[in-house]
């Protein structure tokens, strides 16, 4: 009789424990992916501080009008996206998996917040970049300095120095 009660208890409550275990694992996987992306962003920021423009880049930029500098944050954004691409792809995969399999409210809230922070895009700066003349666009896209994250304010200060 005791064995039957124990077996009945296991059959009734084991699925709840298993579901909680899976939910905990999904939440942990999601947190790990977010942390990995955060670490990569910090690494890319360090790259930005170490990335210094060449003299030819500075002299090229000195001849440009002030309106040209409004596209530099967008160019830096593109470089940061390139730098963090693998981690964002991994996070997107984990988000998709957890989103379709999770029912816990805290996990769902974490998913929504992470999606907003990580994958929201402002296209207004892209318009300014696309409106550049072909020579300027080609220079930026082919220049090694702009292919890595960089300090936008530091670059502007170097260009405006006399």
Please describe what each predicted stretch is:
Residues 65, 72-73, 133, 144:
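Residues that cap or delimit alpha-helices
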Residues 19-66:
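Immediate post-signal-peptide N-terminus of mature secreted/exported proteins
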């Amino acid at each position: 009789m005791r064995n039957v009660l124990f077996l009945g208890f296991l059959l009734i409550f084991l699925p709840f424990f298993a579901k909680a275990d899976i939910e905990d694992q999904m939440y942990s996987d999601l947190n790990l992916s977010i942390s990995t992306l955060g670490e990569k962003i910090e690494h890319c920021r360090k790259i930005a501080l170490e990335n210094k423009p060449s003299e030819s880049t500075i002299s090229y930029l000195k001849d440009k009008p002030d309106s040209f500098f409004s596209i530099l944050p967008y160019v830096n954004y593109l470089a940061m996206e390139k730098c963090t691409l693998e981690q964002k792809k991994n996070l997107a995969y984990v988000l998709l998996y957890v989103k379709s399999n999770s029912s816990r409210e805290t996990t769902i809230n974490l998913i929504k917040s992470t999606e907003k922070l990580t994958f929201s895009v402002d296209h207004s700066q892209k318009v300014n970049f696309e409106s550049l003349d072909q020579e300027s666009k080609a220079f930026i896209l082919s220049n090694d300095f702009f292919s890595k994250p960089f300090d936008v304010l530091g670059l502007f200060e170097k260009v405006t120095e006399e």
